[in-house]
Each structure stands twice: as structure tokens, then as C-alpha cells.
């Protein structure tokens, strides 16, 4: 009879409701955890899909290279102060952003550091420390497709890429750094080849003009700067090299601490050399070393 009393029946009903609510709460918690796991899985799948798409994307398209040759070949060969060209948005931006991120995260311990009045920079040509996208972009820029493009653009036949990246690879200039105006070494002893062409690609997003860091191309007498090129993200500079192709970054970099000027550098060679007056092998010729 006691369970038939109104107050006791009410308490029993309340207990039942509380138990039902607790069960529903536990079920909702489980559903939320499942939803969180599904959301994380979805993001992982999307990230993997984007990564796969990036792997399928060419570093630079053959169509774009043909277009550049068609429209810029003559401009390249006639450009002052020596054959050169500046190409913006040159490689796939997504791939280059990944390269920039890899380079930013690298341990600089094994990099070569130069600290002289005419040259203050870091560099590495050690491919074993490159990230996967960095290795991929260097492979593409040393490929037959790209070397053929360079031959057609510049008119230099028989170009040979350097798998060892001698003097090239990754370059970095920190605040206060510089690279004096110079002409490059002309003979590559290891491969018995003559240096003919430089390709530089810059990694610097949101570069501020006030920081400086411009690449300067000087006249053949090393007296006057003819062209200044800001090192902005995805800008490529291609130019002929000889003992009169003076260039450099001669003014100390004025970027904030923690910022730096980063670039990819690749050099190309030939067996023959068209400059009979310059057949004596030499190292880098800095104008600061020459008598005034």
C-alpha cells in the first residue's frame, strides 16, 4: 500500500527520470566523441587529398615554359646590362610555399656561414638535409624539360645541369648580411665544365621594399648598377654568366631580426666556352678586390 501513496510514487518517477537523463547524457557524450573523431578524420582525409593533389601538380608546367620562350626569348637576349629576365609567379605557388616552410624549419647547424666584409650569408648544397618538396623542386629545375627550356630561352646550346649544386642550393642572408658585386667563378673543376647560366628563385613572402635585399645587375665595367630586382616570393631571375656579368646584393640587409632573405640557386654549364679572352679558370671576382 505504501507504494500507492502519491508522494512515494512521485519519488519513484523522479528517480526513473533522473536515470533516463543520465543515460541520455552518457549517450550524448558518446555521440559527441564520435563526431569529434569523424571531424578529425575528415580533416586528415582533406589534408591527405590536398597533399596528393600537390604531388600531382607539376612544379612548372610545360605549357607555361613554351609560352615564356615564345614571348620572352628576344627580350632575354637583348636585356641590359647582359642577357637576363625576371619572371614572377614562375613555379607552382603551393609547392613553393611548402618549400619555404621546409627551409624555414631547417636546422642551420650544418650550413656554411660566410662572414667577410664582402660576403655575409649562409648556404647549403647538401641535398640530404632538404625536405621532400625542396628535393622535388631542385629535381624539376635540373630536369631535361627545364634545361631544354633554358636552352630555347637563352640560345645557349648543350646546357648541363649540376646534380651536386656546387655553390648553389639554398641561400640565406640575415639582417646586416650582403653579397658584394661580383662576377661568378667561370670553370667547374669537378665536372670540367664552363659556367654559363644562373637561375635564382626567391622564397620571401610579404617582402618589404624598405628592407632592401635587391639583386643588382651592373654594367660590364663594374661601374654602375643598371637593374635592381626585389627578392619577392616566387620571382625567378635567369641570367647569363661571364667574367663581365657583375651582380650582387651589396647593401646590408635592413630586415627585422628573425626575418631573412632566402633563395634557391641553380647553375648550368657547357663543355665549350664562347669567351676566348676568358679561358683562364678563376674563382669569384669581387669588384672590391679590383684596383680602382
Regions found by a protein language model. Name each.
Residues 2-30, 44, 176, 187-195, ...:
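Catalytic core of Fe(II)/2-oxoglutarate
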Residues 29-32, 39, 46-49:
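Coiled-coil heptad-register positions
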Residues 37-40, 54, 65, 92, ...:
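Polar helix-capping/helix-linker motif
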Residues 46-79, 105-119, 283, 291-292:
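Short acidic N-proximal helix/loop "leader" segments that mark the beginning
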Residues 56-58, 107-109, 157-160, 205-209:
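Proline-centered turn/helix-capping motifs that create local helix->coil transitions or kinks
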Residues 73-154:
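Non-heme Fe(II)/2-oxoglutarate
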Residues 101-104, 129, 138-195:
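Non-heme Fe(II) oxygenase catalytic core, chiefly the N-lobe of the double-stranded beta-helix
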Residues 198-200:
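Eukaryotic charged/polar low-complexity linker/IDR segments
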Amino acid at each position: 500500500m505504501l507504494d500507492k501513496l502519491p508522494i512515494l510514487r512521485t519519488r519513484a518517477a523522479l528517480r526513473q527520470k533522473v536515470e533516463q537523463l543520465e543515460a541520455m547524457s552518457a549517450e550524448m557524450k558518446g555521440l559527441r566523441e564520435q563526431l569529434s573523431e569523424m571531424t578529425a578524420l575528415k580533416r586528415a582525409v582533406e589534408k591527405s587529398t590536398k597533399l596528393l593533389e600537390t604531388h600531382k601538380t607539376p612544379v612548372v608546367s610545360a605549357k607555361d615554359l613554351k609560352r615564356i620562350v615564345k614571348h620572352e626569348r628576344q627580350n632575354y637576349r637583348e636585356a641590359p646590362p647582359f642577357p637576363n629576365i625576371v619572371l614572377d609567379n614562375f613555379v607552382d605557388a603551393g609547392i613553393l610555399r611548402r618549400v619555404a616552410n621546409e627551409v624555414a624549419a631547417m636546422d642551420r647547424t650544418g650550413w656554411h656561414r660566410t662572414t667577410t666584409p664582402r660576403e655575409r650569408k649562409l648556404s647549403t648544397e647538401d641535398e640530404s638535409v632538404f625536405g621532400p618538396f625542396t628535393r622535388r623542386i631542385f629535381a624539376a629545375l635540373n630536369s631535361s624539360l627545364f634545361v631544354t627550356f633554358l636552352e630555347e630561352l637563352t640560345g645557349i646550346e648543350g646546357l648541363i645541369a649540376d646534380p651536386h649544386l656546387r655553390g648553389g642550393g639554398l641561400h640565406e642572408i640575415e639582417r646586416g648580411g650582403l653579397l658584394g658585386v661580383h662576377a661568378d667563378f667561370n670553370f667547374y673543376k669537378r665536372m670540367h665544365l664552363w659556367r654559363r647560366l644562373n637561375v635564382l628563385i626567391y622564397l620571401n613572402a610579404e617582402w618589404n621594399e624598405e628592407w632592401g635585399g635587391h639583386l643588382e645587375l651592373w654594367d660590364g665595367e663594374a661601374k654602375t648598377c643598371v637593374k635592381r630586382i626585389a627578392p619577392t616570393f616566387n620571382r625567378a631571375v635567369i641570367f647569363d654568366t661571364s667574367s663581365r656579368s657583375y651582380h650582387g646584393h651589396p647593401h646590408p640587409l635592413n630586415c627585422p631580426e628573425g626575418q631573412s632573405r632566402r633563395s634557391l640557386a641553380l647553375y648550368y654549364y657547357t663543355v665549350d666556352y664562347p669567351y676566348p679572352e676568358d679561358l683562364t679558370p678563376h674563382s669569384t671576382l669581387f669588384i672590391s678586390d679590383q684596383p680602382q
